[in-house]
């Protein structure tokens, strides 16, 4: 396996994306990842199968589990219009209904999930993977004076979760978008590692590589590599030479060039071998590159593999 660790990220777990997720949806997320025929079990088996061909990995692969946001309002958009300001909607913990207008109840929900994930990992007994920490899903974090801080209070809630994770020997991670609010305060939140998304791959990219490098160095960040597969939204974001329909992708050459600039700039600017890297590849994007019969696709795939396996930080 190329990567040392994997993020288990779920972006939408409610039936209606406009409503905030409830406890039942958080449980559904757990059931998905810990299904004996899917999720972590499938990854564990995949590594076992690979070990039969190329030998056992030097260590277990780490899993970082995403923490959904305990959102203040049941329906945030309606609340901002004054139509639905319900904050007691999520469910209960030990028979007590959580009221997400209280930061202490939002913290309780976070810690409930941390405990639930740890318990399920202990019970599952995977051979090749292990839980190494938790990932804050929100890509921007608020501090006093920030946008609608009173509904978020991340400096209170996230720091409390970080402290708890560290008390039970779990890591704490964050991957914000480029120049996101909260990056400048990231050390105060208690993260073990913050990795910034350059967001350079997409057509509406706002930042230059000089600006990206400066932010990474100033705040001690890692860097995310980014591309989309054929599930990219919009479809013009796909790096593959062909679309799902089999038709040529007219945006493929542009997208390949943009992605390879990540690798080239990481090396040229001395970030390679110095800062941690993570990969975002959309839905199945890395797999699609790996099995593609297209020569240009395979060239990009092999350049990415070479970038990963030869990284001095892996040695």
Placement of each model-derived feature along the sequence:
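Generic structural signal for well-ordered alpha-helices
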Residues: 43-51, 110-122, 155-162, 209, ...
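Aromatic-lined carbohydrate-recognition surfaces of secreted/lumenal glycan-active proteins
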Residues: 59-72, 96-113, 131-139, 158-183, ...
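Extracellular glycoside hydrolase catalytic/binding regions
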Residues: 113, 141-157, 162, 166-210, ...
């Amino acid at each position: 396996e190329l990567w040392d660790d994997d993020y288990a990220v779920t972006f939408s777990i409610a039936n209606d994306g406009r409503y905030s997720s409830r406890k039942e949806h958080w449980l559904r997320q757990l059931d998905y990842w810990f299904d004996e025929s899917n999720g972590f079990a499938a990854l564990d088996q995949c590594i076992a199968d690979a070990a039969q061909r190329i030998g056992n990995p030097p260590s277990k692969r780490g899993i970082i589990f995403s923490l959904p946001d305990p959102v203040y309002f049941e329906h945030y958009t309606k609340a901002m219009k004054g139509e639905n300001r319900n904050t007691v909607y999520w469910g209960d913990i030990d028979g007590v209904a959580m009221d997400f207008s209280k930061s202490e109840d939002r913290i309780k929900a976070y810690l409930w999930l941390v405990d639930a994930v740890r318990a399920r990992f202990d019970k599952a007994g995977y051979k090749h993977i292990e839980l190494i920490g938790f990932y804050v899903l929100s890509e921007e974090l608020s501090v006093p004076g920030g946008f609608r801080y009173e509904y978020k209070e991340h400096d209170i809630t996230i720091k409390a979760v970080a402290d708890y994770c560290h008390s039970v020997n779990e890591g704490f991670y964050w991957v914000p978008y480029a120049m996101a609010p909260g990056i400048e305060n990231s050390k105060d939140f208690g993260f073990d590692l913050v990795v910034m998304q350059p967001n350079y791959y997409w057509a509406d990219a706002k930042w230059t590589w000089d600006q990206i490098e400066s932010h990474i160095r100033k705040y001690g960040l890692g860097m995310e590599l980014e591309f989309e597969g054929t599930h990219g939204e919009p479809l013009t974001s796909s790096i593959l030479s062909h679309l799902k329909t089999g038709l040529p992708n007219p945006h493929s050459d542009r997208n390949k060039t943009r992605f390879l600039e990540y690798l080239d700039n990481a090396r040229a600017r001395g970030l390679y071998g110095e800062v941690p890297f993570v990969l975002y590849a959309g839905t199945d994007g890395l797999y699609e590159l790996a099995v593609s019969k297209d020569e240009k696709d395979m060239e990009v795939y092999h350049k990415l593999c070479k970038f990963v396996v030869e990284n001095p930080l892996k040695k």
